Swiss-Prot record:
Coiled coil regions, renumbered to chain: none
Signal peptide coordinates: none
Family listed: Belongs to the methyltransferase superfamily. METTL16/RlmF family.
Protein name: Ribosomal RNA large subunit methyltransferase F
Species this chain originates from: Shewanella denitrificans (strain OS217 / ATCC BAA-1090 / DSM 15013)
């Protein structure tokens, strides 16, 4: 695992601002309003800064990475594409996208690990940049320090965040194989290594505990939590995705059901499911975040199931958050939500940003 540790976030002394003691009073009108009327920001397509918003240029991608060429051809509708149910095709597409748009070389993942869709992953980062008051044009603030919870073998959020915004990242995972693979990617891309620190989470039931160190500060945390409650649920979800892809290719439902599970829709246990599923994971994350209220400006997570939002709002209100936001990202027919919360008041967040820019 890489020993290159990114610069530890240091928060300057703020004896007058109260930043170290975020307001948690239930009587605070700002806190009450933030928790009872969650801000909801709606988008209809990929983020305006997303370079993938117009689709894939397979000719250019194949030129950048010739290994993609054998997988490119007309689909059932006569459009140039790849077979998205073919794990090798999807992996080569990702490698081509990362090389062509982000100058990331030799990206790869071990057999059976999750292969993420690049456009949706980078969308999350663009909206986080907006959340952190980054400019809407050009490069965003380069002083941002981010924490990726459950980075996986693909390490996709830190890789994209470093190349898109030059952010500093700490990435954690409970799976050593995943972190070892990200470390191999860093070895092939030295421009990334100085900005990314990898940390093994030794307690599979913990999220922030054991990862965030004393006197360490982050501008934002991000996470794509496990979705399913069990391996059986995960496999059923995989079969549904394969069935939908088969319909798009004109294959029969029976052919789809007989398709081999996993691979590009695969993933190890920690990537796809946990006891209690997404709802339980989010509840644990929110609970732990309280203990680091003054060490992270914004906590965020993706939320796939809309029904999981209401209990999150209730829990966040009880914990005295100052601000809660929900950002809906529309990617084709899929809607994914970013849930973001902060324990710091508006004035504290403004002081944080000002001191961050002055001190790093």
């Amino acid at each position: 695992m890489s020993k290159l540790i990114s610069k530890q976030g240091k928060r300057p002394a703020l004896s007058q601002s109260g930043l170290a003691k975020p307001s948690t009073s239930k009587k605070s009108s700002a806190s009450k309003n933030a928790n009872t009327e969650t801000a909801k920001l709606l988008t209809k397509a990929l983020h305006p800064r997303n370079v993938h918003k117009y689709g894939y240029d397979f000719a250019a991608l194949s030129k950048t990475l010739p290994a993609l060429t054998p997988f490119v051809g007309p689909n059932a509708y006569g459009n140039i594409s790849i077979d998205f149910a073919n794990p090798d095709a999807v992996k080569q597409l990702n490698a081509a996208l990362l090389l062509h748009h982000y100058s990331i070389r030799d990206w790869d993942i071990p057999h059976g690990y999750l292969c993420p869709p690049i456009p949706g992953r980078v969308d999350y980062l663009h909206y986080l940049a907006d959340l952190l008051s980054a400019p809407h044009k050009g490069k965003a603030n380069r002083n941002i320090r981010a924490l990726d919870i459950g980075t996986g073998a693909n390490g996709i959020y830190p890789l994209l965040g470093i190349e898109s915004y030059s952010w500093q990242f700490v990435a954690s995972d409970i799976d050593k194989v995943s972190l070892d693979n990200v470390d191999e990617i860093l070895a092939k891309n030295p421009q990334l290594a100085a900005k990314l620190s990898l940390r093994l989470q030794l307690n599979p039931k913990a999220i922030f505990n054991g990862v965030i160190e004393k006197d360490e500060y982050f501008d934002v945390s991000l996470c794509n939590p496990p979705f399913h409650r069990s391996l059986a649920d995960a496999n059923a979800g995989t079969q549904r995705k394969l069935s939908n892809l088969a319909k798009n290719r004109g294959q029969s439902q029976q052919q789809a059901v007989q398709a081999k599970v996993a691979l590009n829709f695969g993933g190890q246990k920690a990537e796809l499911w946990c006891e209690g599923g997404e709802a339980a994971f989010l509840a644990n994350m929110i609970s732990e975040s309280k203990g680091f209220a003054a060490q992270c400006l914004w906590f965020t997570s993706l939320v796939s199931k809309s029904e999981n939002l209401k209990p999150c709002y209730a829990q966040l209100a009880k914990q005295g958050t100052s601000e809660v936001k929900t950002i809906e990202m529309h990617q084709g027919n899929k809607i994914t939500r970013i849930l973001a919360w902060s324990y710091l008041s508006l004035s504290q967040r403004q002081a944080w940003a000002k001191l961050r820019d002055q001190s790093r």
